[in-house]
Amino acid sequence: MNKINESQLEMDEISKKELHESIIESLLFVSGEPLKLKQISAILECTTKRAQEVLNNMMLKYNDNCRGVKLININDSYQLVTKNENSDYVRKLLKTNTRQALSQAALETLAIIAYKQPITRIDVDEIRGVKSDRAILTLQEKKLIQECGRLDVPGRPILYETTDEFLKNFNLGNIDELPPMEQIASELDEVAVDEEVKEGTE
C-alpha cells in the first residue's frame, strides 16, 4: 500500500470517528437519559469496543474544553450533564435541586442507605431512632433508591439500595466516590438550619 492510500485511509478513519462523535452527541442530547454502551454501539452499528473508544475520546474533549456540559459514565451508561462549577447558575433557572426538594428525614434516610446498602427499613429505623416509612416512599418515588432483594431471615424484609439516578443527581460516577460520612453529616446540618429559617419566616 502506497503512502497516498495510507493517508486516505487515515483521513477516512478520522472522518468516521468524527461522524460517530456527532451521532452520539445527538443521541445523548435527544435522550436526556443515560444510554447504555451496548445501546449506543447497536445504533452506530459498530462494536462496543469501537463505541467505547469514541466515547472515551469525547469525554476527554468535554473535560478539556470550557464547555458547560460534560460526558459522564455511570455503570457503563453515558449521559451529558452540566458541569459542577455551573450548578449555582443552573439552580437559579430551575429554582430547586434534589437536596432542597428532600426533607431532613428523607436526606437522613438517603444517607444511611447510601453508606449501609443493601439495608432493610428496620435497620434504617434503628439507626435514625424513628420510623422511616414515609421517607423511604418519597425516595422511591424520586427514583433515588430501589428494592434490591430480601434479607434471608424470618419475615424476609425488603433490602434497599441507591440507584443510578442517585449517582447522577449527586454527581457521582459510582458509589465508591461517596464523600466521607462527616461531610454528608455537615451538609445535612446545613439543610436542617435552612428548614428552621424557612419555618420561622412562614
Curated annotation (Swiss-Prot):
Taxonomy, superkingdom: Bacteria
Subcellular localization(s) per the UniProt record: Cytoplasm
Protein name: Segregation and condensation protein B
Function recorded in the entry: Participates in chromosomal partition during cell division. May act via the formation of a condensin-like complex containing Smc and ScpA that pull DNA away from mid-cell into both cell halves.
Disulfide bond positions: none
Cytoplasm as UniProt keyword: yes
GO cellular component term of the entry, any: cytoplasm
Taxonomic placement: Bacteria, Bacillati, Bacillota, Clostridia, Eubacteriales
